[in-house]
Amino acid sequence: MRKKLEQIKENAFKELQDKRKDLDIESIRIKYLGKKGELTHILRGMKELSKEERPIIGKLANDIRTALENAIEEASQRIKSSERESRVKGETIDITMPGIKQNIGRRHPLEQVLEDMKEIFVSMGFTIEEGPEVELDYYNFEALNIPKNHPARGEQDTFYINDNLVLRTQTSPTQIRTMEKQKPPIKMISPGKVYRSDSVDATHSPIFYQMEGLVVDKGITFADLKGTLELFARKMFGDEMKTKFRPHHFPFTEPSAEMDATCFVCNGEGCRVCKGEGWIELLGCGMVHPQVLRNCNIDPEVYSGFAFGMGVDRMVMLKYGIDDIRNMYESDMRFLNQF
């Protein structure tokens, strides 16, 4: 058995010297040290040895096992080191070659305008509130004075997840959640993504950004609403910006209005963009409906408020004269590099 052990050691060491791949080294380990390996087989037969031979052969077998394990590890490290050196040589950088200029990214115009809008309102004392994009039907509709089967629901093509969950069609639900959590005075904006089941075209997208605002306190009037939004428009588009309000209808405000601004293309002269009117719709607004306040346990006899909402994508299009909303979602560097 001593001769067998010495022969196994000699054969294993000889095979290790000839191998050039890590996979071959592993096959040698399995051949000699694996569960069915040659050395393992001999160790299992030691019970047939005499008591005198057993400790001598056992020590020799363990020494050979240790020597083989060390040799296998050294061979594996040698091969890995050789492969690493070859790889490094193949990846050598020729410092005389001209460098490749990296394309520098730019802030997306949608992000720029959204940040500008938030900064304007924060400077006016508004806080920023956030809410879930997957919203309860109650917060998206019912709490906003739009009960089930109300005709106003037909104006918003809604993505329903089930009977009680929707992808929010507006950020107004955040106003309800804020009024439930906070007592007046409240002065907040809620920017974020909203979803409508619209076909994609130059002016419509199933996903777009919206910003809504809410002010609730004692003695709030339409004059406060008008002054706030006119100040926002001047800060956003310049002091020369002219605005006007015209009556409209929203279920969650009474009275309601839409604010128009002078056309950015023709400066109020009339063109194709403004359909010859000289004005472009900017946002919707109004005094918070008393029922909406009641739904949030706020007494409309004590408190009043105003709310407004605007599409951020629309603001970008107006500010930069973009005529197709799809340009903002196609990641075309030729378009983005213009801003």
Curated annotation (Swiss-Prot):
Its EC number is 6.1.1.20. Gene3D superfamilies: Bira Bifunctional Protein, Domain 2. GO terms for biological process: phenylalanyl-tRNA aminoacylation. It catalyses: tRNA(Phe) + L-phenylalanine + ATP = L-phenylalanyl-tRNA(Phe) + AMP + diphosphate + H(+). It is an enzyme of class 6 (ligase). One of its GO terms (molecular function) is phenylalanine-tRNA ligase activity. Coiled coil: none annotated. It is found in: Cytoplasm. Belongs to the class-II aminoacyl-tRNA synthetase family. Phe-tRNA synthetase alpha subunit type 1 subfamily. This is Phenylalanine--tRNA ligase alpha subunit. The lineage of its organism: Bacteria, Bacillati, Bacillota, Clostridia, Eubacteriales. The gene is pheS.
